[in-house]
């Protein structure tokens, strides 16, 4: 924390997990210490976890010297909701994303403008009920008129909250799937009657929360999914932090004499095509041994 103390809950969790070595440091300087090593901090092989812009830049600069998980940006959620969804629940999920700080993005893909308005009103009510916001923040919850963006209509909902719905003549489900895959959200919530069917069209998302009873908040704390997820569209090519981040795959190859004899002729042709004569010779020596 800002006072230099380590959160007691973090220390307790570390102890329960068998961690017996904890270093109290943070920021870009922590990344440098872990990557290069110091008199008190041993050098590591992998650095994981999100941070601010300085931490991201530090991780980018040491990548190659050590492995990193990702360059995590501001948190994101995209909620896809049909007409059967509960606007108040959707509103609460969007507002929860704002709690991750400035830059956090919360998007809604809705079936029509009426649903967007209902969610906007629910946001106003929830902000007034739960947050006791200042007049400045309360002013953000007004719902301005829509702006057409072609096949999809965008409607600001307030702050970093934005809602979209299909333009006239556009089908909701295909457009929603296209938005999901183009945006590649960190968190994707599906408030849909047939959420499982919609899943077949989803190719890019960090974590997917299926059904109206599965908000992102459960994934943040207790559902068991990892909270360190790809952001900024990187879900198109990256995955969540997991045990696999800390594992390395190795190829183990072993041939007996007979196998070497069978594989040497095709290897020789491939090697010759590239002009790698010693690759061919290396293999043919084993083939000759197999023939004896």
Model region roles, listed by residue range:
Residues 3-17:
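Active-site-proximal loop->helix
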Residues 178-292:
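C-terminal core of ALDH-fold dehydrogenases
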Residues 1-7, 25-33, 195:
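Short acidic loop-to-helix transition motifs that present clustered carboxylates
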Residues 16-107:
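Conserved NAD(P)+-binding/catalytic subdomain of aldehyde/semialdehyde dehydrogenases
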Residues 44, 104-109, 129-140, 154-158, ...:
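Flexible, glycine/charged-enriched surface loops at secondary-structure junctions
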Residues 70-140, 156-158, 162-163:
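A conserved active-site cap/scaffold subdomain adjacent to cofactor or substrate pockets
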Residues 20-23, 44-48, 52-53, 69, ...:
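Structural motif
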Residues 21-26, 142, 147, 162-172:
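Short acidic-hydrophobic, aromatic-tinged amphipathic segments that line or gate anion-handling sites
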